[in-house]
């Protein structure tokens, strides 16, 4: 084919030809049909959906992706025993003495959540932790866990 036979298009409206695009398959039957045709099939789980992509749940989605892609067992994040001991100690202290139910009511959460926090097995929830800090007047996050948030003046 010589230069006389080929067409060279110049201009802003010039586009390339059609390309094979990536398609999203919804449903098991379409997936099976693609596999029968011998097409390349890759599956990915979408963790963030809708408007939640830019919010705090994106971090959780990243963690789930990490867990999904790793071969070894990834241990879930917990508040730890230091926080658990601080909550238990403060709840039984004089002046702050209260049951788990009373603490749950004041923190606007359930008794089971309080029990998980006192066991040290709960996932760190900033809303619950800040409510507990306010009610118990101790620090549960940062470096000096268990110290009084606003100590009494001498």
Swiss-Prot record:
UniProt DNA-binding region: 100-119
One example GO MF annotation: DNA binding
InterPro entries xref list: Cro/C1-type_HTH (IPR001387), Lambda_DNA-bd_dom_sf (IPR010982), MBF1_N (IPR013729)
Keyword Transcription regulation on entry: yes
Family matches, as Pfam families: HTH_3, MBF1
Keywords attached to this entry: Activator, DNA-binding, Transcription, Transcription regulation
Domain HTH cro/C1-type: 87-143
CDD domains documented for this protein: HTH_XRE
Any single Gene Ontology cellular-component annotation: nucleus
Coiled coil, from the record: none
Record function comment: Transcriptional coactivator that stimulates GCN4-dependent transcriptional activity by bridging the DNA-binding region of GCN4 and TBP (SPT15), thereby recruiting TBP to GCN4-bound promoters. Involved in induction of the ribosome quality control (RQC) pathway; a pathway that degrades nascent peptide chains during problematic translation. Required to prevent stalled ribosomes from frameshifting.
Similarity comment text for this entry: Belongs to the MBF1 family.
Protein name: Multiprotein-bridging factor 1
Species assigned in the record: Emericella nidulans (strain FGSC A4 / ATCC 38163 / CBS 112.46 / NRRL 194 / M139)
């Amino acid at each position: 084919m010589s230069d006389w036979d080929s067409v060279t298009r110049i201009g802003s409206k010039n586009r390339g030809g059609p390309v094979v695009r990536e398609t999203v398959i919804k449903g098991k039957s379409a997936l099976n049909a693609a596999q029968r045709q011998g097409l390349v099939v890759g599956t990915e789980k979408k963790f963030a959906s809708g408007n939640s992509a830019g919010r705090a749940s994106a971090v959780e989605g990243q963690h789930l992706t990490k867990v999904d892609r790793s071969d070894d067992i990834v241990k879930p994040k917990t508040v730890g025993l230091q926080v658990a001991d601080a909550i238990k100690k403060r709840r039984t202290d004089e002046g702050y003495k209260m049951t788990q139910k009373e603490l749950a009511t004041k923190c606007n959460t359930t008794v089971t959540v309080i029990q998980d926090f006192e066991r040290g097995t709960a996932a760190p929830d900033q809303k619950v932790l800040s409510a507990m800090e306010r009610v118990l007047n101790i620090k549960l996050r940062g470096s000096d866990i268990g110290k009084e948030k606003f100590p009494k003046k001498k």
